[in-house]
Amino acid sequence: MSDILAVAREQVLERGVGLDQDQTLQVLQLPDDRLDELLALAHEVRMAHCGPDVEVEGIISLKTGGCPEDCHFCSQSGLFASPVRSAWLDVPSLVEAAKQTAKTGATEFCIVAAVRGPDERLLAQVAAGIEAIRNEVDIQIACSLGMLTQDQVERLSAMGVHRYNHNLETARSFFTNVVTTHSWEERWETLQMVREAGMEVCCGGILGMGESLGQRAEFAANLAELDPHEVPLNFLNPRPGTPFGDLEVLPATEALKAVAAFRLALPRTMLRFAGGREITLGDLGAKQGILGGINAVIVGNYLTTLGRPAEADLQLLDDLQMPIKALNATL
């Protein structure tokens, strides 16, 4: 049998064809002593098909906690005994957060809400926030507001939402182990409506929730079929009070193999470091990931957990001579 990295070099690097599910599984099964070789190839693929620029994004929680869904990783579910309580952010606070995000050089600011889907109150707050931000801050605006109806998709598009995030979270075959209050297919339907409305699709998930390597490869194949503009990769940071609160953190070598494997499966997709990378990878792992396929980062804090200081990520990019993607390059 041909060596999978030799196959990937010819197929992905030279021809630009992503690995299929079986090939991705072979990459995930590589021994640790081939990790450096794997990361180097993933970096070559990223540079060849995406270029050196790194997109920087900040996120803010407009509505925190009190969500009716039972996503087992999430401390914002109202169904679990987690310490997170429901709270809303006002429009001036949204504008200030957007300003601080823009100061980092970020081109993307994502407004997030812990909901099954937006109601009229939330949509009105989002509309007011977007209008206020546009009047004061030069930055692209994304949203992550759960599952949408066709009317809501059209309204968000009319507001000028640049990109919409809705994560599939995990492989289709593993989804019912993670969420039971809605289906994988419902999420998929929202993503299709978003694309048809002309917004960029952002869709990723969380690694380390108990899925097998085969299901991790399946997830990469699911995403390749969806073909989103961006894939955020999160790593489970077990939250107290949630059903996944006692799971072990993913080993760093396993997480880095996944980063590289997803790059080889999705050679032209924006692959973003998201939540959990600090506890899973640490500072060294963050550097290895950016030199192993990653070409976008979330700076600052996440929704309910602390991230690396923005300055640390920006300094790392500077040290690695990775230019931050300019706003005019995204328009």
Swiss-Prot record:
InterPro entries: Aldolase_TIM, BATS_dom, Biotin_synth/BioAB, Biotin_synthase, Elp3/MiaA/NifB-like_rSAM, rSAM. Residues 52-277 form the Radical SAM core domain. Binds 1 [4Fe-4S] cluster. The cluster is coordinated with 3 cysteines and an exchangeable S-adenosyl-L-methionine. SMART domains: BATS, Elp3. The keyword Cytoplasm does not apply. Its EC number is 2.8.1.6. [2Fe-2S] cluster binds at residues 110, 143, 202, 272. Its cofactor is [4Fe-4S] cluster; [2Fe-2S] cluster. GO terms for biological process: biotin biosynthetic process. GO terms for molecular function: 2 iron, 2 sulfur cluster binding; 4 iron, 4 sulfur cluster binding; biotin synthase activity; iron ion binding. Homodimer. Catalyzes the conversion of dethiobiotin (DTB) to biotin by the insertion of a sulfur atom into dethiobiotin via a radical-based mechanism. HAMAP family: BioB. Belongs to the radical SAM superfamily. Biotin synthase family. This is Biotin synthase. It comes from Mycolicibacterium gilvum (strain PYR-GCK).
